[in-house]
Swiss-Prot record:
BP term (GO), one: dGTP catabolic process
Family stated for the protein in its record: Belongs to the dGTPase family. Type 2 subfamily.
Name this polypeptide is given: Deoxyguanosinetriphosphate triphosphohydrolase-like protein 1
Record PROSITE patterns: HD (PS51831)
One Pfam entry name: HD
Length: 373
């Protein structure tokens, strides 16, 4: 039987000095260590058992109400699990703390509202009308520190400070000296997130028929992928798509780990603090592949995320959330007891926003229909 002390000793023996170690993890509220689990393993398990994590199953990735389109389109939950798998693979390859990377990956999208990025933009717009903002990264941190509860004694999950730091997104590869870079484990999750949604949104777009293989030929990423995979058909079969998806993931993960390993070695960082003080991120793709991914992201925005059929769904989502927000704002008594109890602490607009952000697509539509009668 391996005890927590055994697992921590194994980390000390195997992990390089720039990786995070669970034995050094701290929490805002100290608690007794587990006999069998490391601090990061406890964090991971707490995230997995939250209501917010379970609700990801019925939240949009790209296509609203994806189950109505078919059983194989990705939801926010399947995307999260795919990010977890990529992050764990890359972290292991780079000698990082894979449990911390896995935990941050599982928690990184907890703050997404219903209806995907359309819902996020709409809630942010509504909150700005009340002098506040909304973004899913801040909401994820709010969920694990305030809204979810393990016990009646304190709000939140009391996750380690390392996990909480991993939920703070930093949008630029180079930061001002006053800001610290994320840990390498958190950087891996950011890279895995971009990798997963690029690869899998292309796949879902093709399967939906909103994207066509011939359209993708304008992408250098796709042309090189065809050469690598040997799949050049303009009408790829389901088996061809699986081959392309497998080849794309292997290519991206391989490039990420090789480029990051070289960048870490060249940087000379010898501690987690040195990583966070570094001027640039060290988990990165090769310059060529970074260009390919930027091109793919631009392509997806124009051809898939702004496709007229997707835009119709976005319009419906905006109407639903706008009307729900307005109804709860004018008649707070319509709020269920739990969000209503938070009005005194957080203010009415934020209590409404938290309630709406926690909804699944299905529950938002059902609530909207019920209020309209």
């Amino acid at each position: 039987m391996f005890t927590r002390a055994d697992l921590e000793a194994r980390e000390a023996a195997l992990l390089p000095p720039f990786a995070r170690r669970s034995s050094e993890a701290r929490r805002a509220v100290p608690e007794a260590p587990s006999e069998t689990r490391t601090a990061y393993q406890k964090d991971r398990d707490r995230v997995l058992h939250t209501k917010a994590f379970r609700r990801l199953e019925a939240k949009t990735q790209v296509f609203l109400n994806a189950p109505a389109l078919g059983d194989h389109y990705r939801t926010r939950l399947t995307h999260t699990l795919e990010v977890q798998q990529v992050a764990r693979t890359a972290a292991l390859s780079l000698g990082l703390n894979e449990t911390l990377a896995e935990t941050v990956a599982l928690a990184h999208d907890l703050g997404h509202p219903p209806f995907g990025h359309a819902g996020e933009r709409l809630l942010d717009s509504l909150m700005r009308g009340h002098g506040e903002t909304f973004d899913h990264n801040s909401q994820a941190r709010r969920i694990v520190t305030l809204l979810e509860e393990r016990s009646g004694e304190q709000p939140g999950l009391n996750l380690t400070l390392d996990t909480l730091d991993g939920l703070n997104k930093h949008g630029r590869a180079a930061l001002p000296p006053t800001q610290r870079q994320p840990s390498l484990e958190a950087q891996v999750v950011d890279a895995a997130d971009a990798l997963a949604y690029t690869a899998h949104d292309l796949d879902d777009g093709l399967r939906s028929g909103l994207l066509h293989p011939e359209d993708l030929l304008e992408l250098p990423l796709w042309r090189e992928l065809q050469e690598r995979s040997g799949v050049t058909s303009q009408r790829p079969s389901s088996a061809d798509l699986r081959t392309l998806q497998r080849e794309l993931l292997g290519w991206l993960i391989g490039d990420l780990t090789r480029s990051s390993d070289a960048a870490i070695a060249a940087s000379g960082v010898a501690s987690p603090d040195a990583v966070q003080a570094h001027a640039h991120r060290l988990v990165t793709y090769s310059p060529a592949l970074r260009g390919h991914l930027r091109g793919a992201g631009d392509f997806l925005r124009e051809r898939l995320y702004r496709h007229w059929q997707v835009e119709r769904e976005v319009y419906q989502a905006e109407q639903v959330l706008t009307e729900l927000f307005g109804a709860f704002l004018t008649r707070p008594a319509l709020l269920p007891p739990r969000p209503r109890s938070r009005v005194g602490r957080d203010g009415l607009p934020r209590a409404i926003c938290d309630h709406l952000a926690g909804m699944t697509d299905r529950y938002a539509l059902e609530t909207h229909a019920a209020l309209r009668g």
